[in-house]
Regions:
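A structural signal for multi-pass alpha-helical bundles of membrane permease subunits
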Residues: 1-213
Length: 213
């Protein structure tokens, strides 16, 4: 088994999936926080989707992927990872944007800035800590995703969460525990390193809005 191949698959799919989750959730979070679009019903619905067992979506997604040729592809896996992480990212971003001082945006509107310009040049810079924390959490959840990695991939796009389990399969001489342990350590390094590098942003995002000045 090629552990580097599995690591590369997970890295590419997790990065793309995390980026897509942020790109999808950020505008939606702004609309919910500032314009109350769907805040009363859509946000609770999206949050409650996290409680739904993902296995019920496996067969429909598999059949759809089979039709469009996304089975065993990194991009296909990344799409699923993005959709799985959107609820978490949406909740974090919406609560953070709601705590931002609206006076700065109002001043921007007085100067003639539109919604998209405010979103890009005012809201986004003030939300960098939460965006960074959300990206890290989305990356870690994507990296650890096992179910869809097992069902939707066979060889080319197999993630490390699935590939690592192959080393525990008994072969001629039984399980090689030394190799299996080394593989598991390698599999945990990327999210661990990213978490250590970004822990300050995660801490700041968790305390954002706790103190009103």
């Amino acid at each position: 088994f090629d552990i580097l191949h599995f690591l590369t698959n997970s890295l590419v799919a997790s990065l793309i999936g995390s980026a897509l989750a942020i790109a999808l959730a950020f505008p939606a979070a702004y609309a919910m926080a500032r314009f109350n679009v769907g805040r009363a019903w859509l946000l609770p619905l999206v949050v409650n989707l996290r409680a739904v067992p993902l296995i019920i979506f496996a067969i429909p997604i598999y059949l759809m992927y089979q039709q469009v040729g996304l089975l065993d592809t990194r991009f296909g896996l990344a799409l699923i990872l993005a959709l799985v992480n959107v609820p978490l990212v949406l909740v974090l971003l919406a609560s953070s944007i709601a705590d931002l001082p609206i006076e700065i945006e109002e001043a921007g509107r007085v100067d003639g800035a539109g919604t998209l310009r405010l979103l890009a040049y005012v809201v986004a810079p003030m939300s960098l800590n939460v965006v960074a924390a959300s990206s890290v959490l989305a990356f870690i959840y994507s990296w650890n995703e096992f179910l869809f990695g097992l069902i939707m991939t066979t060889n080319k796009a197999t993630p490390v969460s699935v590939g690592a389990s192959f080393f525990f399969a008994a072969s001629g001489g039984g399980v090689r525990w030394g190799v299996a342990a080394a593989v598991m350590i390698l599999a945990t390094l990327p999210p661990l390193v990213i978490g250590l590098v970004m822990y300050r942003q995660i801490g700041r995002s968790m305390t954002a809005g706790a103190v009103k000045g």
